[in-house]
Design a protein with these regions (language model features):
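Mid-chain, well-packed structural core segment of small domains
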Residues: 68-100
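Short, Lys/Arg-rich flexible segments
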Residues: 1-73, 99-144
Length: 144
């Protein structure tokens, strides 16, 4: 940790370290858990008959995070499936359709709330907290 001359400098440094850890270690922990929950809650719940599944919702590139004011906001931005006749989810928010079960143009398998399942699993495991602590330690900040 660098030498600081004021409380404001210390707070600025700590906020920057927290934000860096949120963007890296914590986001990685959330991505890993969301991928598990997508597999369990979404993919394992039923086998589609109208379209061929792409298995993209658990892909790291589709689980993005943005840090604002030491808060990490995570969003699944998997694009709609444009395959099939008619395309099953084109021009729709795929994550919202899957989460709510509303917006299908054919048989709906119902709501598959993978985001809540992710939050519940993280709450139970504390993996996101451990990830933040690891990021702080990596930056030279002692944590308990």
């Amino acid at each position: 940790m660098p030498t600081v001359k004021s409380l404001n400098q210390a707070m600025t440094y700590i906020r920057n370290v927290i934000n860096t850890s949120l963007r890296t270690e914590v986001l990685d922990a959330v991505r890993k858990e969301e991928a598990k929950q997508v597999q369990s809650v979404v993919y394992d719940s039923y086998q589609p008959t109208v379209y061929e599944r792409r298995y993209d919702m658990g892909n790291d590139a589709n689980i993005v995070g943005m840090v604002n004011g030491t808060v990490l906001q995570v969003e699944n931005i998997t694009p709609p499936n444009s395959e099939g006749n008619p395309p099953p989810t084109t021009d729709k928010d795929l994550a919202k359709v899957v989460e709510t079960g509303v917006g299908y143009d054919y048989f709906s398998p119902g709501a598959r709330p993978f985001t809540q399942a992710t939050m519940d699993a993280l709450s139970a495991s504390g993996a996101h907290v451990d990830a933040l602590k690891n990021g702080l330690v990596k930056a030279g900040i002692r944590v308990k």
